[in-house]
Curated annotation (Swiss-Prot):
Biased composition (Basic and acidic residues): 171-184, 219-247
Free-text function comment from the UniProt entry: Acts as a co-chaperone for HSP90 and is required for proper folding of the myosin motor domain.
Region of interest called Disordered, as start-end residue ranges on this chain: 168-270
Organism: Zea mays (Maize)
Protein name: HSP-interacting protein
UniProt-listed InterPro entries: PB1_dom, PHOX1-4, TPR-like_helical_dom_sf
Start and stop residues of the TPR repeats: 26-59, 65-100, 102-134, 496-530, 532-557, 558-591, 628-663
Keyword set, alphabetical order: Chaperone, Repeat, TPR repeat
SUPFAM superfamilies the UniProt entry points to: CAD & PB1 domains (SSF54277), TPR-like (SSF48452)
Pfam families referenced in this protein's UniProt entry, alphabetically: PB1
Assembly and interaction partners: Interacts (via C-terminus) with O1. Interacts (via C-terminus) with OP10 (via N-terminus).
Domain called PB1: residue spans: 285-364
Encoding gene, per UniProt annotation: HIP
Coiled coil: none
Length: 741
């Protein structure tokens, strides 16, 4: 026995019931948003529309697009700063319904308001292809075309008439509207800026029939369901339940006969404006490549492109450029600067067909680009000064044009009265200045020869050394970060290509590591007790050792001596840095009972406010955090060394692993974390699936140990943050994958 035709799965029926509930809630929110919009509460309306979109059942693409367009309208009404949000909502609406002209028009209006007529023209041209009689699109297209022509960019429309009768009726309707001077209005249409109001007023004129919202016929609901581009037909085909809603709306508007003919005439009322452009072909575009150093970007330019147009295209592709020159390669492979539009046509003729033309962009100063066609000469200072004088030549401020410099009479009188009032002679000012400088230098010489001044000089010297060492330390951290540059690999590259890129990246990283090490060493030389430089130097040697080890395995070369030597240097620097910090911490604890020499000097100079003391608890937490992180980093170095020694067959790997576990314990790692690390050592694996350990488990253990100790002990010492929080470079994982692939 089969299932009856009308029988349905209970789960499906329940799902349909839920969809109906959510759909009803969504439409209620939509109506609330419409009421808020009519009250000019655009922010509240946008919030309601967004909630309505979230409650829409899946598959309601048309309603979702309509709501997204309404949200965009709300953003357009708020302020120009919200235009970017409006563009985003229009993009979402077009993703749901690609042929949605209202979203395209609103996005075009936003682009026009933001000063991007080129982007607005693309949307307007698309709408006019679908609807040649769209009045809003025509009005925006006129403004956008004017803006583009002012920039030297010629544009044309490729619009075809839909029907001769429609064109004739559109002409008659246009003449009628011109004669009667009667236009429908929209909510807030007179307050729009940068073409937004014209867009909305024209958009309402092409709607089918004069609908009323909340009993007022002069305000058009900006979220009405009828669309002139076939959106209503699509909605009727996807929603079977719209018939009931249509009946309700029909009953609400009973007694008013819809004027379908007028709707059709309004839709094509602007066809007569596009007759001059009917049949116009789209301008042929050429593909070009714009090369700016290592950055290559593709673009298109018209076949008969002028140099100002090309400079505009380059400026759009590279917005950060202030002044630049455009060059091309001639037959002798020489780079020739393009200064005229004729030279641009020569460069285009040299290009091979079916191959994009390559233009080389070079950034220069403003003086070098003078003389290039399309570049305006900046006015000189004398010209600006002369223009300022001309602007000031207005009424009481006017003066004889032959006198470049002048002083008003009231200025001279005021200066004389002021001198007499205060008894000050301006003629003696120069002598007073020289006398003051002489006394100042004599006082300084007398001061610096005293014994008290020597203590101040010592404190100043120490502070300047610390500042210089810290600057070198930060510069070294910059080079360490540069060494982590990720190699650019294709999705499915060849083995030879990978090796070439890896070799280049390895050389780059080694160079940056060497620069970073030199900076850290110079920092320690500048300030002998700068322990941060030794810790950073130890980590630099450690990262370089790991990179060399992975590179040796991937490329099958012998670098055993170099790797072990780098590990030795890393351990030595960590030990020196730890000892130096322990001595400094001991001296600090001993000096808690008496003030430091620096503090005594600053108190004598009444400058103690420039030194911020931390409490004993904060100092203890900071010391515990530094000790923990140094020991964990030291243990990591020893652990990685044991991995390398095990793979090389050296018996010392057990000793390195044992010392590493001790460092982890001192650093505050839990016994469970240490057991995970020991278990994942390559010596305990029966089958070596990876280079040294299972990445997932070890990363989880490190994360738990790092978070537990770091954030429990308080904030990390700010100077060592880039050292302790630095992750392994991507190149390490690529080399490991190459070795086992």
């Amino acid at each position: 026995m089969g299932k009856p035709p009308g029988a349905r799965n209970p789960a499906e029926a329940e799902a349909d019931g839920d969809d109906a509930v959510f759909l009803e809630l969504s439409r209620e929110l939509k109506e609330e948003g419409t009421r808020l919009f009519n009250r000019r509460d655009f922010e509240g309306a946008a919030f309601k529309y967004d909630k309505a979109v979230q409650l829409l059942p899946a598959g309601r693409r048309v309603e979702a697009a309509h709501l997204r367009a309404s949200i965009a309208h709300c953003y357009m009404r708020m302020s120009p700063a919200e235009f970017h949000h409006a563009i985003h909502e229009c993009n979402l609406a077009l993703e749901a319904v690609p042929r949605y002209s209202r979203a395209l028009l609103r996005r075009a209006a936003c682009f026009e308001a933001l000063g991007r007529p080129d982007l607005a023209w693309g949307d307007i041209r698309t709408v006019l292809r679908w609807e040649p009689g769209n009045r809003a699109a025509r009005q925006i297209s006129d403004r956008v075309r004017t803006a583009l022509e002012d920039k030297g960019i010629s544009v044309a429309l490729d619009v075809l008439p839909e029907d001769e009768n429609e064109i004739a009726s559109a002409k008659g309707e246009e003449r009628k509207k011109s004669r009667n001077k009667r236009f429908d209005s929209v909510a807030g249409g007179r307050e729009g800026e940068n073409g937004i109001a014209l867009l909305e007023s024209a958009s309402t004129e092409k709607q089918a029939g004069p609908r009323q919202t909340n009993g007022t016929g002069n305000h058009q609901d900006h979220t009405e369901d009828s669309e002139s581009n076939g959106l209503e037909k699509l909605e009727q085909s996807t929603e079977t339940g719209e018939k009931d809603m249509g009946k309700k709306r029909g009953a609400h508007a009973a007694g008013k006969k819809p004027r379908c003919g007028e709707s059709k005439q309004q839709k094509h009322s602007a066809v007569n404006h596009c007759q001059d452009n009917i049949g116009a072909k789209e301008e042929v575009m050429k593909d070009v490549k714009l090369v700016f150093g290592e950055d290559i970007r593709c673009a298109q330019m018209p076949a008969n492109c002028s140099l100002p147009q090309l400079r505009e295209i380059v400026q759009n592709k590279f917005p950060s450029l202030k002044a630049f020159l455009i060059k091309y390669k001639d037959k002798e492979e020489d780079l020739v600067t393009i200064t005229l539009s004729e030279e641009l046509s020569w460069a285009s003729n040299l290009a091979v067909s079916q191959v994009p033309i390559r233009f080389y962009v070079v950034e220069v100063n403003h003086v070098q680009e003078l003389g290039v066609d399309g570049v305006r000469r900046r006015p000189s200072f004398a010209t600006l000064e002369r223009n300022r004088d001309i602007m000031l030549d207005n009424g009481t401020i006017g003066h004889d044009v032959e006198h470049k410099h002048y002083a008003d009479d009231w200025m001279v009188q005021f200066a004389q009265i002021f001198k007499n009032h205060v008894g000050f002679s301006s003629d003696a000012y120069l002598d007073l200045h020289d006398l003051g400088l002489r006394l100042h230098y004599e006082a300084m010489e007398d001061t610096i020869q005293r014994e008290e001044a020597q203590e101040i000089f010592e404190v100043a010297e120490s502070k300047f050394k610390e500042m210089a060492a810290l600057a070198l330390f930060n510069c070294g951290n910059v080079h360490m970060s540069r060494a982590r540059r990720r190699p650019c690999l294709a999705e499915d590259p060849l083995q030879e290509f990978i090796l070439e890129k890896v070799n280049v990246s390895y050389d780059w990283a080694c160079t940056e590591y060497a620069k970073a090490g030199a900076m850290f060493e110079e920092a320690v030389k500048t300030k002998s007790d700068f322990f941060e430089g030794l810790i950073a130097l130890g980590q630099q040697k450690f990262e370089q050792a790991k990179l060399s080890w992975y590179y040796a395995l991937a490329c099958k070369i012998n670098m055993e001596t170099e790797v072990l030597e780098l590990f030795n240097h890393a351990e030595d620097n960590m030990e020196k840095g730890m000892d130096m910090w322990e001595r400094m911490e001991t001296l600090r604890l001993k000096g808690l009972s008496k003030p430091s020499k620096e503090k005594v000097v600053l108190e004598k100079m009444v400058l103690e406010g420039f030194v911020k003391d931390i409490s004993a608890d904060e100092a203890f937490e900071q010391a515990s955090s530094i000790r923990s992180h140094i020991n964990i980093l030291w243990g990591t170095i020893l652990y990685e060394r044991s991995v390398v020694e095990f793979n090389l067959g050296l018996p010392s790997w057990e000793e390195s692993l044992t010392v590493a576990m001790e460092k982890f314990k001192i650093g505050g790692a839990s016994q469970a974390d240490i057991n995970v690390i020991v278990k994942n050592h390559c010596a305990n694996e029966t089958t070596q699936e990876g280079l040294s350990f299972k990445v997932e488990e070890i990363v989880q253990a490190w994360s738990e140990m790092h978070d537990a100790k770091n954030w429990r002990s308080g904030p990390l010492y700010f100077r060592l943050q880039p050292v302790f929080r630095r992750r392994a470079p991507k190149l390490h994982h690529i080399l490991e994958h190459m070795h086992y692939a």
